Amino acid sequence: MTPEYVMGLFHSAMKVTLMLASPLLLSALVSGLIISILQAATQVNEQTLSFIPKIISILVVITLLGPWMLGVMLDYMHNLFYNIPSIIIR
């Protein structure tokens, strides 16, 4: 197994991780930003108020994009397991 091959595996793993995590993180960021703007406009300083909308937005994103996320993860794992013999030989 060459260092280039290991770096390629690491690169593809990071790419899949970013693809799967970014929709969840972006939805939490947007909902938190909206709630923070509303809190600043109404001068409500409750720290725990933003958690429920974030949880709801993440659950909505998982519900909508869950099949796509599962497909991406399964494709990556299938390719990884399929290439195990070539990894061992190198």
UniProtKB/Swiss-Prot annotation:
Subcellular location: Cell membrane; Bacterial flagellum basal body
Transmembrane residue ranges: 18-38, 55-75
GO cellular component, one term: plasma membrane
GO biological process: bacterial-type flagellum assembly; protein secretion
Keywords: Bacterial flagellum, Cell membrane, Membrane, Transmembrane, Transmembrane helix
Keyword Cell membrane: yes
Topological type in the membrane: Multi-pass membrane protein
Family: Belongs to the FliQ/MopD/SpaQ family.
Function in brief: Role in flagellar biosynthesis.
Protein name stated in the entry: Flagellar biosynthetic protein FliQ
Originating species: Buchnera aphidicola subsp. Schizaphis graminum (strain Sg)
